[in-house]
């Protein structure tokens, strides 16, 4: 048996429940004209004739309505506009990822500065940053040291970030989440 690695992605563009011209199988429709005006309830043959006279398509846009709603429109143009809108929406979407920076309660100044520099890079790129401190062994009894380190980290990034989630404990780990400041863009 032969299987191909290449799969063709089939996109249904603007054809969710739309029936066009000869695909429409109802007797009468509530007709909407080219400019969006109501033309009333018409037999399908008359609606099709009106669409043919205007050199456009008759498209059934709401088949579940009583009577079904059909619109006289240029389907090719409608499909093009729909694709254009979808493309614009995809461009406007921004994927926000959460990057993690791990610290220890007894972190040294040099290491702290390196982690801080990395977090600043993430924030400048528009990513959120989760700053976590893992307590090992008996360090769990000194949570205030971890809270102090997180407070220093938040203070050092306050010019480009806002605290989205305050420092809190989760098991043997204390964390807070920073988000890029929106007004600084």
Curated annotation (Swiss-Prot):
Signal peptide stretch: none
Listed Pfam families: IF3_C, IF3_N
Gene Ontology cellular component terms for the protein in this record: cytosol; membrane
Molecular functions per Gene Ontology: ribosome binding; translation initiation factor activity
One GO BP annotation of this record: ribosome disassembly
InterPro entries (UniProt xref): T_IF-3_C_sf, T_IF-3_N_sf, Translation_initiation_fac3_CS, Translation_initiation_fac_3, Translation_initiation_fac_3_C, Translation_initiation_fac_3_N
Major location category of this protein: cytoplasm
Subcellular localization, as worded in the UniProt entry: Cytoplasm
Keyword tags: Cytoplasm, Initiation factor, Protein biosynthesis
Subunit-structure text: Monomer.
Family to which this protein belongs: Belongs to the IF-3 family.
HAMAP family, sorted: IF_3
Role according to the record: IF-3 binds to the 30S ribosomal subunit and shifts the equilibrium between 70S ribosomes and their 50S and 30S subunits in favor of the free subunits, thus enhancing the availability of 30S subunits on which protein synthesis initiation begins.
Name of the protein in question: Translation initiation factor IF-3
